[in-house]
Regions:
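Mixed-charge, glycine-accented linear interaction segment located at domain edges/termini
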Residues: 129-156
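Terminal leader/tail segments of proteins
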Residues: 24, 34, 40, 46-47, ...
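Short aromatic-glycine motifs in intrinsically disordered, low-complexity regions
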Residues: 14-24, 91
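Hydrophobic beta-strand-centered segment that forms part of the acyl-chain substrate-binding groove
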Residues: 2-5, 9-11, 78-117, 143, ...
Length: 158
């Protein structure tokens, strides 16, 4: 999928990321793809102190909300779908959306200045639904591990 949308600002996101998923600033949480194979992707996000969520979560001890770490993993899986898993012609006019979370474990926190290593592994496909396992790490320590499903839905209905 090649997403062409006007961009006010997209942080440090590479063109590869911007072309692969529809997310844009301020809700784009992947900076770059580190590695990509047929069924696995590793991406990266550097957490800048200016991030909008650090302003109120929490002012005395800014940390990235766990749900946004999960979103970064979901976006990483969306890039994998776009680059390796889907037939572009069959999904014209569709976008990947989260349809299920099977499990999520939150083990550590992410702070300004941290670099998140985001991993997503493709498990199986059932119709238009793609099953994944994902993790977010910093310095090889797992912050979040999650199992989830992304589905391709008609963008006109959004």
């Amino acid at each position: 999928m090649l997403y062409k949308r006007s961009m006010v600002e997209n942080g440090n996101a590479t063109q590869e990321v911007l072309n692969s998923i529809p997310h844009r600033f301020p809700f784009l949480f992947v900076d770059r793809v580190v590695s990509l194979t047929e069924g696995r992707i590793v991406a990266e996000r550097i957490l800048r102190k200016e991030e909008f969520f650090f302003q109120g979560h929490y002012p005395q001890m800014p940390l990235m909300p766990g749900v946004l770490i999960c979103e970064a993993i979901f976006q990483t899986a969306g890039i994998l779908m776009s680059k390796k898993l889907i037939n572009q012609a069959s999904v014209e006019g569709k976008v990947p959306v989260l349809t299920r979370i099977n499990s999520a474990k939150f083990k550590r926190m992410a702070f300004p200045g941290d670099t998140l290593n985001l991993e997503a592994s493709f498990e199986q496909k059932v119709k238009d639904f793609y099953f994944f396992k994902g993790t977010a790490k910093k310095q090889d320590q797992i912050l979040v591990s999650i199992e989830f499903v992304l589905g391709m839905v008609d963008a006109k209905g959004l």
